């Protein structure tokens, strides 16, 4: 893809979801329910809006336990491709579980996502602090050709994509989330500084992306007024990890 006009930023609306961390599970679930209530309303009112649910079905399960009446709404958005779910049941630490656990995790998440309307066909692993050598083999055997990583990637990776190869020769294409899964989180915080921040993000990531659109991972919702901001800044569009890979 060759850049023909202004630089392009591909923005992925998403959340990174820790079920339990510095607060108990139920406190985090309150935030999850509030978030997805807003996401469902936004997606239903704007067919251009897409949202990625962190690659793990557990967030869907936790939400629907509180909002079972919204299952059909969630499924409709999954079927339309506006809500990207799976392929994992949970995001895992690859060194704390067995190899079979990793495979079963993927199997379960994949099946549950398909039952809801479709699985995101990306090995989404943004927050693992290291990766087992066989992970590309596991992903490839599952039929996944693409992955997204942030943590656990060697410092020597200086581009935005690379081939990740397992000992058996299996390989997947990795989109490296340079700057992390929130590298564009502050982009829309201040309307007066949108152009400045968008240009700064594009400039910071351009060396990695060359003539390709740069990838920005950011907060879940975009204020409607943002559409006009791009006139004085790099062109941008909302997308999903699958489209960005």
Regions found by a protein language model. Give the residues of each.
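Catalytic-domain carbohydrate-binding cleft regions of carbohydrate-active enzymes
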Residues: 1-245
